[in-house]
Amino acid sequence: MDDRVHPEVRRTATEIDTMEIRGAATIADAAARALRTQATESDAADAEAFRAELRATARTLHETRPTAVSLPNALRYVLRDMSSTTVEGLRQSVVDSADEFCARLERAQADLGQVGANRLRDGDTIMTHCHSTDALACVEAAVEQGKHIEAVVKETRPRNQGHITAKRLHELGVPVTLIVDSAARRYLNDVDHVLVGADAVAADGSVINKIGTSGLAVNARERGTPIMVAAQTLKLHPGTMTGHTVDIEMRDTAEVVDDDTLADLGNPTVKNPAFDVTPPRYVDAIVTERGQFPPESIVILMRELFGEGTSEPWAEPSPRAEP
């Protein structure tokens, strides 16, 4: 890591990389707070040195999770105004933007939860995959409305994020049935909605989420079970409007099999993709803090929020051409 990056920020980057910090909204919040820390602790001598230091910090954070689009969206928001000519002016801009971003993040999830809860009826059973605070916000809001909700929770290997979801649902008073991932098709007849989160949503309405989401969506469509994706607008991937693709992160082999077992199996090649892509035709609604949208309408929302292009504040500025 760049020596200019504050130790606390390095620690945050490591925790994001190792998934100690997980969940797109949680990652975005941590990234914004890390930039704030860098800004407040910086002893840069002048404005240009301060900007370079913040770019290095943003790069360090950005490189940790290439698929979690909430991370670069958080970096863009916090570093959106770096026009001041003084260190103190720049520092204040970063601090104010980070504080505003984190406050908006908290409000957005509550608003999203209300929108999603309106799709859930009293007595409904949902099926979940992985762990999504946005999806859980929908359930929490429904419970607060007095609705009785039950849940079938996929364990979500290899890291068992479904266990986190099961624990949180239990805390909300929701009866939980925990199932192995491969049993999902069997239990789809018992559920009224599939409710998942998203790490990113592309301009065409495709949903990038934890590996296994697309297979669940295909099975749900076959069974006629509606699929609701809960995703704050910070999960929208503006780069996909201009043809950029979403990188699918490959996780460490050790998450799947330990070295001794691998050797005993004859050292086969092990693939551990963290995410997959669910085509929009398998998604019924994408629920955001700004309302619910059919997947084909997401590009309109993206244009409203981001315009036609995006900046990358972690990139070094291009050298000026000689006159």
Curated annotation (Swiss-Prot):
Domain of life: Archaea
Catalytic activity from the UniProt record: alpha-D-ribose 1,5-bisphosphate = D-ribulose 1,5-bisphosphate
Pfam families found in the cross-reference section: IF-2B
GO BP annotations, alphabetical order: L-methionine salvage from methylthioadenosine; pentose catabolic process
Entry's EC annotation: 5.3.1.29
Residues given in the record as substrate binding sites: 22-25, 65, 209-210, 235
Keyword line: Carbohydrate metabolism, Isomerase, Isopeptide bond, Ubl conjugation
Family matches, as InterPro entries: IF-2B-related, IF_2B-like_C, Initiation_fac_2B_a/b/d, M1Pi_N, NagB/RpiA_transferase-like, R15Pi
Enzymatic class: isomerase
Molecular-function GO terms, alphabetical: ribose 1,5-bisphosphate isomerase activity; S-methyl-5-thioribose-1-phosphate isomerase activity
The keyword Amino-acid biosynthesis is annotated on this UniProt entry: no
Active site: 130, 199
Keyword set includes Calcium: no
Cross-link (Glycyl lysine isopeptide (Lys-Gly) (interchain with G-Cter in SAMP2)): 210
Signal peptide as annotated in the record: none
Role of this protein: Catalyzes the isomerization of ribose 1,5-bisphosphate (R15P) to ribulose 1,5-bisphosphate (RuBP), the CO(2) acceptor and substrate for RubisCO. Functions in an archaeal AMP degradation pathway, together with AMP phosphorylase and RubisCO.
Further remarks about this protein from its record: Reaction proceeds via a cis-phosphoenolate intermediate.
Stated family: Belongs to the eIF-2B alpha/beta/delta subunits family. R15P isomerase subfamily.
Protein name, per record: Ribose 1,5-bisphosphate isomerase
Organism of this sequence: Haloferax volcanii (strain ATCC 29605 / DSM 3757 / JCM 8879 / NBRC 14742 / NCIMB 2012 / VKM B-1768 / DS2)
